[in-house]
Curated annotation (Swiss-Prot):
Keywords on record: Ribonucleoprotein, Ribosomal protein
Species the sequence originates in: Chironomus tentans
Pfam families named in the record: Ribosomal_L15e
One GO molecular-function entry: structural constituent of ribosome
Cross-referenced NCBIfam families: PRK04243.1
Species lineage: Eukaryota, Metazoa, Ecdysozoa, Arthropoda, Hexapoda
Entry-linked InterPro entries: Rbsml_eL15_core_dom_sf, Ribosomal_eL15, Ribosomal_eL15_CS, Ribosomal_uL23/eL15/eS24_sf
Name of protein: Large ribosomal subunit protein eL15
CC annotations in GO: cytosolic large ribosomal subunit
Sequence similarity: Belongs to the eukaryotic ribosomal protein eL15 family.
Top-level taxon of the source organism: Eukaryota
């Protein structure tokens, strides 16, 4: 096994003494920093490389923290309108996971970069910490690399805002197999339209 494989096996046992101590120290370190900052190198190089990171110019790592827990509905003075069924304010759960939210916040802040992927690094009682892999689409080292220059195309701008990253896809219900029949046609909305629309076929 290579060195990265050993690191990968280490992270599979997060309750081990080694990793509990390491994550505890790292959480303390991340709490002292701003909520979004650039990391000099990935904290988990094995995971970053599996998700597309390369230690070359044009690839950047941003570390971000997201507050854990559900989402409170932003209602002015508690005025909720409509039926009592939709009066909830506190116990609402967001559709997207916190990793997707973290990617979105990095993507909005770093508008000129492309978000490639992200991964979990640590968490404590209040926050979850993620590292987001970003790519500079205008860097020659990226544009000349045939394995990654697909991300330079304009169609891949803000992938994270459209649910095209791995974390974003998880809440869209997109996949293959018998459990993903509700999104046949591209999305839940496309599947619903196809099933609920009246089709008047012209037979010739």
């Amino acid at each position: 096994m290579g060195a990265y494989r050993y690191v990968q096996e280490l992270y599979r046992k997060k309750q081990s003494d080694v990793l509990r101590y390491l994550l505890r120290v790292r959480c303390w370190q991340y709490r002292q920093l701003t909520k979004l900052h650039r990391a000099p190198r990935p904290s988990r190089p094995d995971k970053a490389r599996r998700l597309g990171y390369k230690a070359k110019q044009g690839f950047l790592i941003y570390r971000i923290r997201v507050r854990r827990g559900g989402r409170k509905r932003p209602v002015h003075k508690g005025c909720t309108y409509g039926k009592p069924k939709s009066h909830g304010v506190n116990q609402l759960k967001p559709y997207r996971n916190l990793q997707s939210v973290a990617e979105e916040r990095v993507g909005r802040r770093m508008g000129g970069l492309r978000v490639l992927n992200s991964y979990w690094v640590a968490q404590d009682a209040a926050f979850k910490y993620y590292e987001v892999i970003c790519v500079d689409p205008f860097h020659n080292a990226v544009r000349r690399d045939p394995k990654v220059n697909w991300v330079c195309n304009a169609v891949h701008k803000h992938r994270e805002l459209r649910g095209l990253t791995s974390a974003g896809k998880s809440s869209r219900g997109v996949g293959k197999g018998y459990r993903y029949s509700q999104t046949i046609g591209g999305s839940r909305r496309a599947a619903w339209r196809r099933k609920n629309r009246l089709h008047l076929r012209r037979y010739r």
